[in-house]
Amino acid sequence: MSSPSPSPGSPAPQEIEHALFEVRKRIHPRAVSGWFAGWRWALVWATQLLFYGLPWLTWGDRPAVLFALEDRRFFIFGLVLYPQDFIYLTGVLIVSALSLFLFTAIAGRLWCGYACPQTVYTELFMWIERKIEGDRNARIKLDRSPWNGNKILRRGSRHIAWLVVALWTGITFVSYFTPVRDLLGRIASLNLGAWEIFWVLFYSFATWGNAGFMREQVCKYMCPYARFQSAMFDRDTLIITYDGARGEPRGSRSRKADPQSLGLGSCVDCGICVEVCPTGIDIRKGLQYECIGCAA
């Protein structure tokens, strides 16, 4: 049975194309300061001093922390573990998972907002970006400007700085499996093994790509934690949210105006809460899985 043909004079039906993936809009978060931002940077320093510093510590005549895969021995300060001791690793992972669930139930997404490597390295890379290209408005202006000497210089400097940090991160990662002093000596003499070259470059590329380009996309689409974290919330969980009863109806007004007499809430609709968000969401739309609870 044939479909009915459109009557003469009627407009032809339009085809609507639906994209399978959302087109990413580049986010330029505004720099923030304050108590929570200070805590976030304190944890950036603490985690990175731990990560970059541990391979340099010695315990007797060996590194304090070394996972010697070829010897099948794992040194953690005075503790020496063998493959048959991996049952202890299972216990550590179980305790870590339960701790994550506990802290999430009590205080929301503390891990995501303050200690997750994706958050930490994104903060570090955005700091480098701000130092070279300027704050939010300057970066947006640079994005929209045509390619010229200034743009090439700033973009090139940013990527060089990112690559230096990423490469050192990759070297540090491999130094947990090969003594760092021996590793640096063989890098200087171009005498690295194939697997060492692979893991240095792989970890460097992952750091550069995730923290420099993908950023909030990792939190939105790749990390499974965001999808089920709401199941760990209850009525007593501390969360970062918008107080609609206080803020609505939103609207601009002069500083001296009384919002109640104008029929307005406390929100002046300035949009700064959106500009400072590292995942680019509008917190006024309610609890969203994209929110990492950073309290920016």
Where is each model-derived feature located?
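Short, flexible, mixed-charge glycine/proline-rich loop motifs
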Residues: 103-107, 209-215, 258-261, 265-269, ...
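Membrane-embedded translocation segments of transport machinery
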Residues: 244-266
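Membrane-embedded alpha-helical bundles of multi-pass integral membrane proteins
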Residues: 2-250, 274, 295-296
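Structured cytosolic domains appended to multi-pass membrane proteins
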Residues: 267-268, 274-296
